[in-house]
Amino acid sequence: MRVVFLGPPGSGKGTQARMLTEEYRIPQLSTGDMLREVISRETEVGRKAKAIINAGALVSDSIVNQIVSNRINESDCINGFVLDGYPRTVGQAEVLQQILQSKNMQLDAVIELIVDENALIERMKKRVQETIAVGGQVRSDDNHVAFAKRLVEYREKTAPLSKFYSERGLLKVVDGMMAVTEVSRVIRGFFK
């Protein structure tokens, strides 16, 4: 099973990806986690990414694509994986398609979680409150200004992926406003 999760920030992609990976015993591939991993292992790509991040810039698509390609080659991905946070653009989706084809693989589904923007803001506030309540570290991008920027970026860059994957017959749209367990039930139904 090879799956991509799409949805705006706060839509529950990470939660649903985690639930799916636990049930099917396949890895969840998060670009943030993959970046941190290659940086900590001090690989060549990791050193490049670290230098870019330390300079305050965004890691280029070519580096992210290389990291994803390398990660998909690892043995735990033989039976599948769930991509969370990648691809973010149509360009990355096209590269992912090439990467998978070169490995004689293809995506089984792209799951898009649809959530009302007001609900997204409420979810972000709740996440901040819950993090503070347990003495955790609040994410630097969990504030109104940063969150609004992330939503704009999602609309401009990531939302066009819906059309890209719909045209390829891969898109499965799920109402992300339902309870977490109900969303999970609907998603699992795609793979029965």
Curated annotation (Swiss-Prot):
Listed InterPro entries: Adenyl_kin_sub, Adenylat/UMP-CMP_kin, Adenylat_kinase_CS, P-loop_NTPase
Disulphide connectivity of cysteines: none
GO cellular component, one term: cytoplasm
Localization per Swiss-Prot or TrEMBL: Cytoplasm
GO MF annotation, one: adenylate kinase activity
UniProt pathway: Purine metabolism; AMP biosynthesis via salvage pathway; AMP from ADP: step 1/1
UniProt-listed Enzyme Commission number(s): 2.7.4.3
Keywords annotated in UniProt: ATP-binding, Cytoplasm, Kinase, Nucleotide biosynthesis, Nucleotide-binding, Transferase
Binding site residues for ATP: 10-15, 127, 178
Catalysed reaction equations from the record: AMP + ATP = 2 ADP
Region (NMP), start-end ranges: 30-59
Membrane spanning residue stretches: none
Domain of life: Bacteria
Chain positions covered by the region annotation LID: 126-142
Binding site for AMP: 31, 36, 57-59, 85-88, 92, 139, 150
Record-level GO BP terms: AMP salvage
Subunit-level organization: Monomer.
Protein family per UniProt: Belongs to the adenylate kinase family.
Domain statement: Consists of three domains, a large central CORE domain and two small peripheral domains, NMPbind and LID, which undergo movements during catalysis. The LID domain closes over the site of phosphoryl transfer upon ATP binding. Assembling and dissambling the active center during each catalytic cycle provides an effective means to prevent ATP hydrolysis.
Function: Catalyzes the reversible transfer of the terminal phosphate group between ATP and AMP. Plays an important role in cellular energy homeostasis and in adenine nucleotide metabolism.
Protein name per UniProt: Adenylate kinase
The species this protein was found in: Bartonella quintana (strain Toulouse)
Gene that produces this protein: adk
